[in-house]
Amino acid sequence: MPRKVNGPVVSRTVLVASVIMIVIGAVLIASVPRTRVSLDDTNVNTHSASDYVQFTTMNEGKIEKIIVHKSDLLFDTEITDDKNNIHPKSMIIEKKPELADFYRQVASTNATDAVFVYPIFTQAAYGKDGFYNYYNKDCDIKCLTVAIPPGFVPTYSSSMSISKVLPLLNYSEITDVDVDKNPDILKKYHKVIILHNEYVTKKEFDAITSHPHVIYAFPNALYAEVRTNYTDNTFTLVRGHGYPSSSIENGFDWKFDNSRYEYDTACKNMTFYTIPNGKMVNCYPAYRSLFDKSFLEMIKES
């Protein structure tokens, strides 16, 4: 008759120890602190009134909401809604005393270490009687010449949240106008941070793309060329964004244009990738400077 073969005998002690290790591992994984962020795709535009704050974006005509637990915000944030727009009308952002160590970690080290360029032309282009009124056929060619704003009025399209966060972290700031009037100004800084500077002049484009260390913190930057008239204090669309021909996309024919990433506002796989004169982000981090430590760390460390 065939010889009976006994299966391997597992020590009860080993088995019990293994179960204990599995339980401990599960507890440790569950206890790791996480930023409580979720993406809600429903078409509702209200802010949470309790423990969460809601940031709303528009993605190809579809409203997307990013929901963040208030305790995970990196700054005390007060949002004023705009009844006529899905995006906030304004924000007040202040540091949290308990995050002082983190702020020091991600702050600019000195006045010439890093500078960001505020997109003042983009702010105006998206404004009333601006370029988008022309694109939407609500206005004729006269809307392609726009007044240069006298000051910052940060909006969603002009990188509202990060343009308020970076000054709190000691980053120097200049505007499109500063670079257009004096392109060499960028040479003063080790690192240049470009936000959603969609509309820039040729002199500004050349100054940015020739700088050796640029962080393109938003996609769709350097997308269309404008021309300034400082006598009239205006700027005019020259080329790009389907103008003067619908076949024209990037007004500078820039081979590193990354506008395809601007439609990813969830940023679930956000990273910076390398190009010859710096790094670019692979999604549209609209409000991430308010709650995502890794975003601010990447800007600092890149």
Region spans (language model):
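N-terminal Sec-pathway targeting helices
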Residues: R3-I22
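Intrinsically disordered, low-complexity segments enriched in small/polar residues
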Residues: K4-V5, V23, N59, P276
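Transmembrane alpha-helices
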Residues: S18-L28, A114-V115
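Hydrophobic single-pass membrane-insertion segments
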Residues: L28-L39
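Aromatic-Pro/Gly-enriched surface loop or interdomain linker
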Residues: N43-D184, N258-R260, C267-S302
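Helical hinge/lid and interdomain linker segments adjacent to catalytic or ligand-binding clefts
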Residues: G151-N229
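A glycine-rich, often tryptophan-bearing local segment used as a flexible ligand/cofactor-contacting loop or short
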Residues: E198-V281
